[in-house]
Curated annotation (Swiss-Prot):
Lineage, opening ranks: Eukaryota, Viridiplantae, Streptophyta, Embryophyta, Tracheophyta
Family: Belongs to the PTH family.
Keyword Lipid metabolism listed: no
Disulfide bond entries: none
Name the UniProt record assigns to this protein: Peptidyl-tRNA hydrolase, mitochondrial
Positions bearing the site annotation: Stabilizes the basic form of H active site to accept a proton: 108
Record EC number: 3.1.1.29
GO molecular function: peptidyl-tRNA hydrolase activity; tRNA binding
GO CC aspect terms: mitochondrion; ribonucleoprotein complex
Location(s), subcellular: Mitochondrion
Catalytic activity: an N-acyl-L-alpha-aminoacyl-tRNA + H2O = an N-acyl-L-amino acid + a tRNA + H(+)
HAMAP family (UniProt xref): Pept_tRNA_hydro_bact
Positions contributing to tRNA binding: 31, 81, 83, 129
């Protein structure tokens, strides 16, 4: 059963400000397992791996609060539907008085091959309506991090909207499950290291992984 968010504010620590990891997706069983909901999946997998229960509800989001290696972390899955994600993320970040350099958004990305991840310090919305809403509620500010999860491009002339709301094929699901495990490592890296060489090396490894997979499939 979900409980209300406690008034406890992790921002009282003068040593560590909390990180907010925000996964984008659509609420309801209808959308579970679809490409557009991989942000939700990443938050759930990470929460389970670090022992944070997603049993809080506030700011139009299902949430969890806890610590990872003594670092405060807030996890959230907006329940507003994708295109209105900012209605949750904006008030949530404001409540905790979080600077945007302590916010990371996890989202699907059609510009990356299926199962390939990329950490990004900041950037635009790339025509992703969920990101667009988040940015609008951050007053147009784009200075927040992202974990982009590649879902590949729709085949042929397939409508991108239909592609996003479709579930993964079995081979794609296997790649995505491996990617989610790697995503846990990526989020732990974010907590341990500021943007810099370690993030760049992670992205290089992800690019090499894709090239290696492509070579095997082409052989």
């Amino acid at each position: 059963m979900l409980s209300r968010l406690s008034r406890r504010c992790y921002c009282t620590s003068s040593v560590h400000r909390p990180w907010l990891f925000l996964g984008l997706g659509n609420p309801g069983d209808k959308y579970k397992g679809t490409r557009h909901n991989i942000g939700f999946e990443m938050i759930d997998v990470f929460a389970e791996s670090v022992g944070i229960q997603m049993n809080l509800v506030n700011f139009k989001a299902i949430m969890g609060q806890g610590f990872v290696a003594d670092l405060p972390v807030i996890l959230a899955k907006p329940q507003t539907y994708m295109n209105l994600s900012g209605e949750s993320s904006g008030p949530l970040a404001a409540y905790y008085k979080l600077p945007l350099n302590r916010v990371l958004v996890v989202h699907d990305d059609m510009q990356l091959p299926c199962g390939v991840l990329r950490l990004q310090e900041k950037g635009g919305h790339g025509c992703h309506n969920g990101l667009k809403s988040v940015m609008n509620h951050f007053r147009g500010n784009r200075e927040f991090a992202r974990l982009r999860i590649g879902i590949g491009k729709p085949p042929g002339q397939m409508d991108p909207k239909a592609f996003l709301l479709q579930k993964f094929s079995m081979p794609a699901r296997e790649r995505m499950d491996k990617a989610l495990a790697e995503g846990v490592d990526a989020l732990k890296l974010v907590l341990a290291k500021d943007f810099g060489e370690s993030w760049r090396l992670f992205n290089v490894e992800q690019k090499y992984k894709h090239l290696k997979q492509h070579t095997i499939l082409s052989a």
